[in-house]
């Protein structure tokens, strides 16, 4: 067996010039690691800390579209992301890994999903993975409060327009979820000579309603009918009796620790033994490496139709795929293997951003982050040509106000919006138009500012998940409170607005303090945190009136 580097280089050389169009599931993977500062005792509740290792594009189609360029195949992902910072990061990541993003968009009606993969120890102390899409209503995804995926639509001739816009015929079309639009695009591309690769983990088995389950299964079979290669796992698709109805396909079923098997046309199933990696660290992405390496291998073998395939060559291609997938589990993260390759150069991730006519800045509450539920709500209702900056505030108050003043000097925002702790800082940024929502003017009394260690409740850009308030920092908060109104000017009195929740039991009393220094006070019916409908009804009109 060739060394892994030789295998990869061989694939790159032979697959050079081949193309793959792909659509389906994309997510921003948040790779985290849990550590145990006091050690780990099996069966006990152990104190732990969590930190973010990195954040990057993932999920099945996202991985395949970024793994294939590493193996020599040019990719063209089709994706509709939103205009959140995470949505733009996905577009940049795709470009950075070598994908052509001409069919990727960032719009208000797009969707962005975040997915946490946490490396932990299970009850016995063995390494394990925990997956999560959202937590206690906290936002882990784009402009929505739950996973938000937007696929190519069948409406208004969108599929035909996309097909007509292609100035090349892709060698492979990859999709990973049952959608009518994906099936329709496959139907348009196959007659042109494109090989269609369909990977699925859902045939409707989990749907409780029998009518819905049958409808999902029929939709799955329609996708199979319009595909050439169909890949699935034995865990998700244990019953493979349907394959006997198709005689012009290649079916691939992964078997976990038992390897992989395939059925080509009318041939019987052939099982290939697994390739184990004794240096296992993370299985995340192994299945996607299997798909990517197999696609690259058949591209290199010029085996881009089922009619050209033989069981011998399919076996060879799958063994190459298994070898690369086995190697990949020796690294943390689905694309850890690429990160570790010092000789592989990532691409420039610069993308064309919108031309903004207004620039706003949002400052968050304590123990939070700039990109939080409230900023999501604001961004959701802002005009598309208005930019929203979402910096993460620092735990040290003096360092934080200094950082914010420097940022304002650099960015020159048209408006600053601060909530709770953010309102405390915002009203001190003299010389700018500001809205302070339930400002915490006695911030040193906040439970999140007490002396000791605290956890950030939302992921931050720097990946740090905890902070410590020292006695000196607590004194600095008190000192800042005492002088917070010293810089108020006549301009500030007219251009710093207070917006207070009538049901705010946390800092509602600060309205009287605020009104002693500023001239404009408004209220909304809610509590300390604004709901989306309150943002739309009360905050957005105020923003537009001020700007």
Predicted regions mapped to residue ranges:
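The alpha/beta-hydrolase serine catalytic core
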Residues: 433-547
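A short beta-strand-loop structural module common to alpha/beta enzyme folds
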Residues: 51-58, 78-79, 384-400, 523
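Conserved phosphate-binding/catalytic region of the ribokinase-like
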Residues: 2-17, 241-354
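Gly/Ala-rich beta-loop-alpha elbow adjacent to hydrolase catalytic centers
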Residues: 417-427
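Conserved N-terminal subdomain of the carbohydrate kinase-like
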Residues: 42-52, 70-172, 193, 344-351
């Amino acid at each position: 067996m060739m060394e892994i580097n030789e295998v990869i280089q061989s694939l790159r050389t032979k697959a050079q010039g081949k193309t793959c169009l792909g659509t389906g599931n994309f997510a921003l993977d948040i790779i985290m690691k849990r550590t145990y500062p006091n050690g780990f005792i099996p069966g006990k509740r152990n104190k732990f800390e969590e930190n973010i290792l990195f954040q990057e594009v993932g999920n099945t189609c996202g991985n395949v579209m970024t793994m294939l360029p590493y193996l020599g195949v040019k990719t063209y992902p089709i994706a509709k992301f939103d205009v959140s910072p995470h949505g733009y990061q996905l577009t940049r990541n795709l470009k950075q890994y070598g994908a052509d993003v001409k069919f990727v968009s960032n719009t208000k009606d797009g969707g962005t999903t975040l997915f946490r993969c946490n490396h932990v120890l299970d009850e016995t102390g063995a390494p394990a993975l925990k997956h999560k899409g959202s937590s206690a209503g906290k936002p882990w995804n784009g402009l929505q409060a739950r996973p938000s995926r937007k696929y190519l639509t069948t409406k208004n001739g969108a599929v035909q327009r996309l097909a007509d816009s292609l100035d090349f015929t892709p060698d492979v079309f990859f999709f990973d979820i049952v959608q009518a639009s994906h099936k329709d695009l496959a139907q348009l591309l196959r007659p042109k000579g494109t090989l269609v690769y369909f990977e699925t983990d859902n045939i409707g088995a989990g749907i409780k309603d029998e009518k819905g389950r049958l409808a999902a299964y029929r939709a799955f079979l329609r996708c199979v009918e319009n595909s050439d290669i169909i890949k699935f796992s034995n865990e998700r698709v244990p019953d493979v009796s349907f394959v006997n109805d198709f005689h012009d396909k290649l079916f691939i079923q992964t078997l976990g620790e038992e390897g992989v098997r395939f059925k080509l046309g009318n041939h019987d199933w052939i099982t290939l033994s697994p390739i184990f990696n004794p240096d296992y660290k993370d299985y995340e992405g192994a299945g996607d490496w299997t798909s990517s390496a197999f696609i690259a291998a058949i591209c290199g073998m010029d085996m881009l139709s089922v009619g050209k395939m033989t069981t011998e060559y399919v076996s060879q291609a799958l063994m190459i795929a298994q070898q690369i997938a086995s190697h990949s589990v020796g690294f943390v993260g689905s694309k850890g293997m690429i990160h570790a390759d010092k000789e592989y150069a990532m691409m420039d991730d610069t993308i064309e951003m919108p031309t903004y006519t207004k620039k706003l800045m949002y400052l968050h509450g304590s123990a939070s982050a700039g990109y939080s539920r409230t900023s999501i709500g604001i961004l959701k209702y802002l005009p598309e040509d208005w930019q929203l900056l979402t910096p993460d505030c620092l735990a040290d108050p003096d360092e934080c106000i200094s950082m914010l003043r420097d940022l304002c000097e650099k960015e020159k925002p048209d408006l600053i919006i601060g909530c709770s702790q953010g309102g405390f800082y915002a009203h001190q940024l003299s010389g700018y138009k500001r809205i302070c929502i339930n400002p915490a003017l006695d911030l040193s009394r906040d439970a999140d500012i007490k002396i000791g260690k605290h956890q950030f409740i939302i992921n931050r850009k720097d990946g740090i998940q905890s902070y410590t308030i020292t006695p000196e920092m607590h004194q600095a908060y008190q000192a800042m409170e005492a002088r917070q109104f010293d810089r108020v000017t006549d301009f500030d009195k007219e251009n710093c607005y207070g917006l207070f929740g009538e049901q705010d039991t946390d800092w509602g009393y600060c309205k009287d303090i605020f009104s002693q220094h500023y001239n404009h006070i408004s209220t909304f019916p809610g509590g300390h945190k604004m709901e989306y409908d309150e943002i739309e009804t009360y905050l957005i009109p105020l923003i537009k009136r001020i700007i």
